[in-house]
Amino acid sequence: MSEDNSWKTQLNLPKKDTRPQTDDVLNTKGNSFEDFYLKRELLMGIFEAGFEKPSPIQEEAIPVAITGRDILARAKNGTGKTAAFVIPTLEKIKPKLNKIQALIMVPTRELALQTSQVIRTLGRHCGVSCMVTTGGTNLRDDILRLNETVHVLVGTPGRVLDLASRKVADLSECSLFVMDEADKMLSRDFKTIIEQVLTFLPKAHQSLLFSATFPLTVKEFMVKHLHKPYEINLMEELTLKGITQYYAFVEERQKLHCLNTLFSKLQINQAIIFCNSTNRVELLAKKITDLGYSCYYSHARMKQQDRNKVFHDFRQGKVRTLVCSDLLTRGIDIQAVNVVINFDFPKTAETYLHRIGRSGRFGHLGLAINLINWNDRFNLYKIEQELGTEIAAIPATIDKSLYVAEDDTAVPVPVPIEDPHIVHQRRMQEQQQQQQQQQGQQGQQQGYPGQQAFIPPQQGQPQFMPVPQQYMQMNQQQGMPPNQQQPPAMGYPPQQLPTGYVAQQRY
């Protein structure tokens, strides 16, 4: 028996996450990952990623998915849904079969990149090749990469349909179809495209649908396309137990002052601030920068490469504050985020649920603060009723134990997400470099010196603007907490505000 488990002693395990967790992830049947009879290479990746025991959604979904049955799963944000479908996907893939065997569809590029990174992390020993394809990127690069071996295709609906229609992506042997954020995927924006994509898959494929909310459109899709699905519902309550929710009643022109007060009093590890429009995202990011805080921003109107850079740097903790639209409300898992602020109160309960779910990930603690004005009061009551939760008035002092981990070093740093196109370009450059070196060695044998291959730097990457010295002095004069004393990035990426958009009239 000891010989069977000897491989565990050779694993490169990360530092254990000692932060307290809630019943959202602890209320399990007591199973372990070994109980699912997964292949050893997959277990190695699971343990090296820091996974210890399966969460409730993983415990329910993994063994059923491995048997090949369709699944319709509903669970809270931040409880391990991604691993719940990635693990059975990796278990079912046959590395020696050079075909696309699994298709994972997600609504945004950021979520696609994150999902692919989970696949690469958990499947690092499995020999599985994963490719990401999304709109807004070079189609030619995708076509070239599909000439190589791809086992798992992760993408957004439009680009996947484009590649399948061109017969570049061969889905004829794709036996597994996964939809994350199924409620969004089956909205009017994507439903027709999803229906078309399914025509390229074999009829006898397995379908896994995961989401936190299931509207009528999902049920209609289930009746039409799923065969006797196993239904999982772990939503006794909609909001995560580890998130404390407050509202602050302020006039519109006082919101920025209130935000500044929160920055000075809260112990923020990382924070996401949501606005309801792209113009307000950019303007608020500029205002926060003017106050002397480091700040990035992201919204759907930005260039794709800029969004990628923001997402990557924020995940790596290079800045504490991110201002964004609802672009990042779905699926984005950054465990260092412990505070979410709704600078603009959302219009629907669904949006509110996804926004505050960016904190308190995987059963940990988080804080959600809503800045509301007179026009938001009825919406606040409506969302409380729909979600069955209470949003209390913000107290004068917020207990740090509600949202701050005792040991900050226990917060796991995510594995860097590399843009697949940059990875492909780097691989091609390395191949060219090797070819040139080989030619150079042959040339030296023939009597002329070989030339060293030169790899040019990546072009078009957004740069930070210089930091004015007065902002650093302002930090010290205002007595800001140590965690906020850092050089601010000037409204990342540097762009001009819309013409005629006067800040004083809004705040």
Swiss-Prot record:
Localization (cell): Cytoplasm, P-body
EC numbers on record: 3.6.4.13
Chief site of localization: cytoplasm
Domain spans labelled Helicase ATP-binding: 62-232
UniProt-listed InterPro entries: DEAD/DEAH_box_helicase_dom, Helicase_ATP-bd, Helicase_C-like, P-loop_NTPase, RNA-helicase_DEAD-box_CS, RNA_helicase_DEAD_Q_motif
UniProt keyword list: ATP-binding, Cytoplasm, Helicase, Hydrolase, mRNA processing, mRNA transport, Nucleotide-binding, RNA-binding, Translation regulation, Transport
Protein name (database record): ATP-dependent RNA helicase DHH1
UniProt organism field: Candida glabrata (strain ATCC 2001 / BCRC 20586 / JCM 3761 / NBRC 0622 / NRRL Y-65 / CBS 138) (Yeast)
